[in-house]
């Protein structure tokens, strides 16, 4: 149930209580006083409804704008971002990386990479422990377990938690990503008793908080903006306002959905095998499962709408370029 629906239900409940109990049977006052007070209460509720109505309309307008303007990185932006966050190598120093030590570089690279490649929410990233990283018995399959944790060393005031039942999930890891994570665990993340994966790298090695992660992203954003100011220029329609964990998740969702749709289209031997609607539904279900959205969440549909709009615009431009008549 949305906030709007809850507030409407609350107003209805107030009116029900008044109708049921605002009478001489339950109130020890005169009928005249009952009537006068009821008028004042009704006027009060009416004023609150009007305020709520304005708030509700404003909220809908803002939400509509956001829906049509989900900010995510283009493929070029993603490639340039990875050039910024790539950790130093023994033979090659990354002068664009804003973090000075290799330990910080690898930790922060992995955080961005997991969000960008696997669609993790920031809270899910904060829940990861060293035991979240698993391999199969024959070591040919690797997984990341997304679940709640009860680490006794978690001192964070605002503790992260799983968003919904569907957010509990097992995500298959690329073998190279598994190696990066194990390198981090064995060489960097081996200094205290806590199992939390992403912590401060200085004593007392506290688990990273929401504000700590936002500060890391702000540092990366400043380096990104310095190297590529055009990406933040709002005169360009595909610019971004800022780089945040949610922008990474938006980017992952759109890229993943587009890949799934193209994959299912290519697998369809004949156009009669699967309709476009069937292909879209399969791709949306993949996105929903991988992203940990609940069955009634409309978020996957937002990305589908954007994909359809982008595809339609591309088709129209192709049509224009192929027209026989020219101006």
Where in the sequence are the language-model features?
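Non-catalytic DNA-binding core/recognition domains of DNA-processing enzymes
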Residues: 1-38
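Short, charged phosphate-coordinating catalytic segments
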Residues: 20-23, 115-141
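Flexible interdomain linker/hinge and immediately adjacent N-terminus
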Residues: 26-91
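Basic, Lys/Arg- and aromatic-enriched nucleic-acid-binding interface segment
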Residues: 84-122
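Conserved tyrosine-mediated DNA breakage-rejoining catalytic core shared by Y-recombinases
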Residues: 89, 93-97, 127-180
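C-terminal catalytic core of Y-nucleophile DNA break-rejoin enzymes
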Residues: 156-182, 195-221, 241-245
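Short, basic (Lys/Arg/His-rich) helix/loop patches that form interaction surfaces
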Residues: 214-289, 293
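Catalytic-site neighborhood detector that most strongly recognizes the C-terminal catalytic loop/helix
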Residues: 278-284, 289-318
